[in-house]
Amino acid sequence: MKKLVVLGLAMAMTASMVSGVSALPVQAADGEGLKVALLLSGAANDQGWNQTAYEGTQKACEKYGYELAYTENVEVADISAAFADYASAGYDVVIGHGYEFGDPALEVAETYPDTKFICTEADASADNVASYVMACEQSAYVVGIIAASMTESDKLGAIGPIPGDSLVKIINGYEDGAKSVNPDIEVQTAWTNSFVDTQLAQEAAKAMIDNGVDVIKHCANACGNGAMAAAVDAGIWCQGDSYDQSSLAPDNILDSALYNLDVVLDTALGSIADGSFEGEVYNLGMADGAVEVLLSDNLPEDVKATAQDAIDKIVSGEIEVERDYTLRD
């Protein structure tokens, strides 16, 4: 069962553990000692999207001497209340990790003008709201090149959770990368409508495998771990997302698209530390170190070289990857 979001933090916040709310003490360093809270859509140890944000925020808070608390498994319907609870409890900065946190942050920010709200992958900005959008389509493009180079059936599978902009751009970038190698390649797509239900992704992956897919990529948070399990069971290739996921499929993984939230959140929290914070939407990509692709030793050397060439050209600007939010057929 998922951990429930606990509301009413203003009445029951402690420095160690509040039912459902984890407060992480960090070693003091030179800084203002601000209180930072992080809201996650899944578990902080999901070996993916949420864990990279948790570890990135922890690292930045240690650097700037900030106190960190976090809440896991925040349902969309509870986001506004979770933001408000931390703000009313005296937290100086509240971070929402994911596109779905953008609109609630804008809503709550009006009531708490002295609190700064930071969102990832959202298009939200105000005097006290800043968003940081990663060019995940760039890493997806490279991953698509790899998949197209490794498939024997010319059928690829891509599994996402909910078709929001930040996920759609990944699936589209993946397809564009694959079709840069083979314009006739087929990319089968499935949306699980869940960030955490591994069984749904596993079932979607099995259906794709039955339909001839021999490489599966996911961008489905913890849910996507089920897709990787299906790939392992079927003996086909898979591709990780957000985090180094090689431990989930050591003999089957081709790569992991990494989202370096330590870079993103160091940038965000650093702007607060040096007084340069502005409520804008910022874009960070491969050239900034915000996204990258971790290549597996399972890849042949020629495919590694092809992937690295694409990475170098994206960083230099020779290859410009389109950010497409269109939900394709």
Where are the language model's segments positioned?
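Hydrophobic core
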Residues: 9-17
